[in-house]
């Protein structure tokens, strides 16, 4: 499954005194099996971009093509339904949208709406919940008797229960404790590597971006100003400063180390493990 943006612009309240162009002339492509991160300041157009992915918003100008379906501002919703079935959208604080009295009913709400096999959906959701640390009897419990972090994980899995090919998540770990953050991020990564799903992550946490993403899309004032690998992105401190993007902690540590020892390691470390490996190599060659 491939999603392609061709010269996509979106204007809110078009034709009124309050009209605002949130994204303009966006050209990019999302491929199944890859992990994308979308970063940029608040108001840079990230949320508008992802809402055009499955036509929650339709382009004011330009086209979004999902496999053989082309979406424009004129496309009727009945032609978009197959797209929405294959693209799972998890917005910020999804726990606020929980409403069923048991976890099981919450899990089958989406699949039932799309006339999917409910037993398969329940089994798939149960496996994902177990991966997130829930007990085996979780399906019979009420989500409203759980902690905020547990409710967040329940809400995320309720979207994943539809087994979408492309998963779009907007700040999924905001406000979670460190263990829950790791569980959610590792689950998303495993869905990419083990099930060939595309992950599209909006995040302000550059540590997550560095560790998990294959490609990073940087947005500024409604435009894509960069689309590259994390290693290439975090090499250019001047551009990062201009885009108001912080360095990941491990990359900052590497730069501090290099400055202190007046040296240059052979590569950019995106994880603690990679930094340790580069450090050992540097020690060996001293």
UniProtKB/Swiss-Prot annotation:
Enzyme class: translocase
Domain of life of the organism encoding this protein: Bacteria
Cited SUPFAM superfamilies: P-loop containing nucleoside triphosphate hydrolases (SSF52540)
Family assignment from sequence similarity: Belongs to the ABC transporter superfamily. Energy-coupling factor EcfA family.
Subunit and interaction comment: Forms a stable energy-coupling factor (ECF) transporter complex composed of 2 membrane-embedded substrate-binding proteins (S component), 2 ATP-binding proteins (A component) and 2 transmembrane proteins (T component).
Pfam families (alphabetical): ABC_tran (PF00005)
Membrane topology: Peripheral membrane protein
GO molecular function: ATP binding; ATP hydrolysis activity; ATPase-coupled transmembrane transporter activity
Residue ranges constituting the ABC transporter domain according to the UniProt record: 3-246
Enzyme Commission (EC) number: 7.-.-.-
Function of the protein: ATP-binding (A) component of a common energy-coupling factor (ECF) ABC-transporter complex. Unlike classic ABC transporters this ECF transporter provides the energy necessary to transport a number of different substrates.
Name of the protein in its database record: Energy-coupling factor transporter ATP-binding protein EcfA2
Keywords: ATP-binding, Cell membrane, Membrane, Nucleotide-binding, Translocase, Transport
Keyword presence, Iron: no
CDD domains noted in UniProt: ABC_cobalt_CbiO_domain1
Cellular compartments annotated: Cell membrane
Gene Ontology, cellular component aspect: ATP-binding cassette (ABC) transporter complex
Record gene name: ecfA2
Binding locations of ATP: 40-47
Main subcellular localisation: membrane
């Amino acid at each position: 499954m491939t999603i392609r943006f061709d010269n996509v612009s979106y204007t809110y309240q078009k034709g009124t005194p309050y009209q605002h162009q949130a994204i303009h002339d966006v050209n990019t492509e999302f491929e199944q099996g890859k992990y994308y991160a979308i970063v940029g300041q608040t108001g840079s157009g990230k949320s508008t971009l992802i809402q055009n992915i499955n036509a929650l918003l339709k382009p004011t100008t330009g086209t979004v093509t999902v496999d053989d379906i082309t979406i424009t501002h004129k496309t009727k919703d009945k032609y978009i339904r197959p797209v929405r079935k294959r693209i799972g959208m998890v917005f910020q604080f999804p726990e606020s949208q929980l409403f069923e009295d048991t976890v099981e009913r919450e899990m089958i709400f989406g699949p039932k709406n799309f006339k999917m096999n409910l037993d398969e959906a329940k089994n798939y959701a149960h496996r994902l919940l177990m991966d997130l640390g829930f007990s085996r009897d979780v399906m019979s419990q009420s989500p409203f008797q759980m902690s905020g972090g547990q409710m967040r994980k329940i809400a995320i899995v309720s979207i994943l229960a539809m087994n979408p090919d492309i998963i779009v998540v907007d700040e999924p770990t905001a406000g979670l404790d460190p263990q829950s953050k790791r569980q959610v991020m590792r689950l998303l990564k495993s869905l990419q590597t083990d099930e060939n799903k595309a992950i599209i992550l909006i995040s302000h946490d550059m540590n997550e971006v560095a560790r998990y993403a294959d490609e990073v899309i940087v947005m500024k004032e409604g435009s894509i100003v960069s689309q590259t690998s994390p290693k290439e992105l975090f090499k250019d401190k001047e551009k990062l400063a201009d885009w108001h993007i912080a360095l990941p902690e491990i990359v900052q540590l590497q730069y501090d180390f290099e400055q202190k020892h007046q040296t240059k390691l052979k590569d950019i470390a995106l994880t603690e493990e990679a930094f340790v490996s580069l450090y050992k190599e540097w020690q060996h060659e001293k």
